[in-house]
Each structure stands twice: as C-alpha cells, then as structure tokens.
Amino acid sequence: MKFRFRYAVLPCLLPAFAAACSTEATHRRPNIFDDEESFAAVTFSSNADSLFLSWELTDDRIQFDSYRITDNKSQQVLTVGRDETSCLLTHVPYNEPVAVYLSLVAGGEVVKTAKTDVVIDGLDKTTAATLIPDRGSVTGGDGTYSIPLPDGRSIFLMGDSYIGPVTNGQRPTSDHMFRNTYILYDEGRVSAIYGAGGDRNASAAVPPGVSDESRKWYWPGHGFVEGNTLYVFQTVMYQGAEGMWGFRYETTDILEYELPSLTLRRTTRIPFRGSEDIHYGMAALNDGDYVYVYAQVDVTNDADPISEVLVARTTPAKLCTDWEYYTGSGWSTDPSAAERLEGLASVPVSSQFNVFRLRDKYVLLTQNKRYNSGEIYTFTSDSPAGPWRNKQLIYRIPAMENRKLFTYNAMAHPQFEK
C-alpha cells in the first residue's frame, strides 16, 4: 500500500536553519506561445507543495470569458473569471520541472495558451519562518522533535540552539550556544524555553548535578504525552575526546513535566543497562495499551555507516522500571534478546528518527545517515515493531552540492498534516 505523505518534514540545517528556510522565492519566467509574443506576464512563488501563480495581461485585445490553469504533473484544472489575476495550485511535485499552462477560454474553447516552467523546492517556508524566526525566540538549532499537547499547542525539542538575533542571514560569532531548548508553538506564535534552575545561560534541561554543560549535557530524544504528563527522553552526552566530534553517549534520562504548566516533576534514568552504542529514546510512540521506545544502534559510524533499530515496550505506569524488548517473534524482559527490526537494512537509519501512526498504518521516517546524503525515506508497517515495508524516497534535500550546508536527522510533524 502506497501513501502520498503531506505532513511537515523539517531536516536539520547547519549553520543556520533560519537562513536556509525563511526567504520565500519569487520567480519570473518567459512564456511561450506558438512563437508569438506572450499575452501575459506570469510570476510565481511557492510554499511546501503549493504554488501561487499570478499574472498580468499584456494584450487586452483578446476576447475571452475566463482563465483555465493546468499543469502537466498533477492534472489539476482550475477555472477563474477574467477579472482574476492569481490562483493557487496544490500538490505540485518539487525538485523537478513542472509545466504550468495559463489558457484564455471563450465560449468553452481555448483561444490562447501560455506555458510557464517552474521548479519548487518543497520547503514549508511559512512554518519554518514562524518556528525559527530571526529574533524573539530560538533563532537556530537542530533536533526539532515535536510533540502535540492536549490543549492544541505543540512543543519542539531542540538540540544545540541559539537565542540571539539573526540579521541579514548572519549571527554574531559571540552568541551563546545552548545544548538544548524547547519551543512552545501556540496557534502560530512561538516562545523559547531555556534557563533551567533560573540560570539564563543554562539549557532548557540540564542533567542533575551538572554545572558545566561543556563537559556533560542533554541532547533531546523524542517523547509523548499521557494524561497530564509530558514525558521527554533526554540523552546524556559527555565530551569524551577533543574536537567537535568528540562527544559520546552515556545513557538516557526520562524527564516528566506537568501539563499545562511544563513544570519539571522528576528525572529518572531509563531501566535499560547495556551497550553505549544502543541509544533508546530516539523515537517514541504512545499507542493504545503500550508505549514503544525505539533505539538507534551504531554498528559502524563512519563515511559508510551501518545502523539498526531496536524497540522496547512498556506501559506509562512502568516506563521507568520495566521494559520488554522485541525479539523478532515476541517480547522478552531480557534486553540482550532484542533483535533488529526487519525491513530497514537498505537505509542506514539516522541517529534521530520518527515512528508515528497515520490512519491504519505505522510510519517510520528517517534521513539516510550517510554524510550529507539529503535523502529522506519512509517505511510503513501494520505493527509498531514491523516488519517494515514500502520503502519510499519522499524527499531529496536540494543544493546538497553546497559544501557549507550540512543536513541530518529529518523529522516528521504529523499533527500539522494538511
């Protein structure tokens, strides 16, 4: 069974997420009509998979009743009155040429047609610019997990983040970097959460007993809501070697926040004890009687990485104490009995990924972990534990030849599905 996915997907972009996503492109293209002079000047802009087309009639001698707008990909047909000067096309394919035709219609017959060739990038610039503004909230960061809250808000869990303003696509090199922040999204408005313990230079969450976040810190995993509690998996990281790639994983903590105030109630270490290559909490799914907690496993972590996915299940009441691990055929309380999930071997799953339910299927979304591949894939299953099938390349990040652009760990946000 194949799906056409239309939820928001946000890849992490370095060095500046806001700079990459906040400018809406407007283009002018020459029109072609049977070697004659064009009868209209056409411009367009795009957001996500929507194309806003506008035009100005340059030949007012033509007699017609209406405009007809079509394209050669989606097979949409729109008809608007002769006094209209714009229209909106949706579900337009991105990162490939699309021919859009503007026709003049008189008495049901087409009298003239102009063709405009467009290519859109598929980026949801409106949501991105709202989520990551140039000032007033988090202005850059990675991670970008999101969790819908019961009152309609969403909380975004960010990793390394900046709060300082961005001017003309640049930020001061002196800006303080937070190891994690939260963004509270409420009907198009955003606010940043940081400063744990009243220290404005502290991240939103800090491991208990830690005073120097340059040596030990939290990077976010995923989370879920149960009742009036928000559960967030935070991975405990430490600087184990010199250089920007010297970070190491230690374990994962579960942070419990009271809703709707987001007051931190308790911090508890996950019950899993095992290899530091197994990172539980990288995806989470609250589904019926069970909470499913997914782990990304580094088999090799180099230029040609190999990674696997494991899953444990528990109940909200036993989240901090008792887990069962999927063995490939059933569930066991022995963590060493866990087996990798079937069907994912063709794509190295990224360090952070998503599993969510969409209608009657489960969806796993990941970005290819190979360095700067730019490929985002989905797999579907009838069960939270797989087997995973229907591999789909749903998006390829454009401009990957730009060596200053580094993308990783794409995230899905199904609560914003159109």
Predicted feature residues:
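Beta-rich carbohydrate-recognition and catalytic domains
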Residues: 22-31, 114-137, 149-216, 225-274, ...
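Beta-strand-rich modules
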Residues: 89-111
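Solvent-exposed loop/turn segments flanking beta-strands in beta-repeat/beta-sandwich domains
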Residues: 58-73
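C-terminal motif of bacterial Sec signal peptides marking the signal peptidase cleavage site
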Residues: 18-20
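Pro/Thr/Ser/Gly-rich low-complexity, intrinsically disordered linker/stalk tracts
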Residues: 23-62, 94, 112-121
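Short beta-strand segments within Ig-like beta-sandwich modules, predominantly Fibronectin type-III
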Residues: 77-84
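Beta-propeller and closely related beta-sheet repeat lectin domains
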Residues: 142-145, 208, 212-224, 280-283, ...
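Bacterial N-terminal signal peptides that target proteins for export
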Residues: 2-9
